[in-house]
Amino acid sequence: MAVLIENLSYTYPDGRNAIKNINAHFEKGKKTAVVGLNGSGKSTLLYHLNGTILPQTGRVNILGEEVSKKTLNSVRKKSGFLFDYPDHQLFLTSVYEDIGFGLKNLGMGRGEIEAAVDRILKKLNIEHLKDYSPYQLSLGQKKICAIAGVLVMEPEIIVCDEPFSGLDSKVKAAFKAILDDFSKEGKTIIFSTHDQDFCYEWADNVYVMNEGELIAGGDAVSIFNNAEVLQRAGIVMPKLARLFGHKNPAPRSVEDALNLL
């Protein structure tokens, strides 16, 4: 088990109950999506999965370690977080410095940091961006540089809040390829999204949130063919599920669907 959540609730200082009594588990090596409308509690839930927010009530366990103030450094080595807005994690004078920032905080030596940063720049094919200020980059470039700063830490889990929002199709494909490579290494991906078509094709498992509550969870095909759950959450059924959900097995991609015709 990568992540276990038990009876997790969180109330913001303004009195808003963001999430209420959440119980969930995220399987190791799987891609799990968290879906729901804006304000349903997705981001607040994800913020708990690397200690960005600490539990008020309930427990969060990351790869066998309970999240608390004392375990934050250890937890964040295991679970990296990618914010919806990359400006939240790109704030130094150059891309190179930003990518190495987390390693520096861990007390790693300069030579080790430089070697690790050089490796990830080459792996993601962004060596040409290393001397740029983050403020000179496009949104897509910022997102890829931000995930480089996560991957350089070599976490077992990546938590992504709306990783594809605002990206054009070309950058989205490049970003998906990065996550695919991470997944092929047997690592765990947990992400929120409003793109139900992509989620239906790519996610292994799905959790559905509505008004701070977790109302359903299961494999992607089962969840996205459950009209009652989708209606309650205000989610539109993915096109492939709407057209071919009655098939067994149901096609998960356009290519698979074309093979049925």
From Swiss-Prot:
One of its GO terms (molecular function) is ATP hydrolysis activity. The keyword Zinc does not apply. Transmembrane segments: none annotated. Pfam families: ABC_tran. InterPro entries: AAA+_ATPase, ABC_transporter-like_ATP-bd, ABC_transpr_CbiO/EcfA_su, ECF_ABC_transporter_ATP-bd, P-loop_NTPase. Residues 3-236 form the ABC transporter domain. The keyword Transport applies. GO terms for cellular component: ATP-binding cassette (ABC) transporter complex. It is a peripheral membrane protein. It is found in: Cell inner membrane. Gene3D superfamilies: P-loop containing nucleotide triphosphate hydrolases (3.40.50.300). It comes from the Bacteria. ATP binds at residues 36-43. SUPFAM superfamilies: P-loop containing nucleoside triphosphate hydrolases. Keywords: ATP-binding, Cell inner membrane, Cell membrane, Membrane, Nucleotide-binding, Translocase, Transport. PROSITE patterns: ABC_TRANSPORTER_2 (PS50893). Its EC number is 7.-.-.-. Belongs to the ABC transporter superfamily. Probably part of an ABC transporter complex. Responsible for energy coupling to the transport system. This is Putative ABC transporter ATP-binding protein TDE_2132.
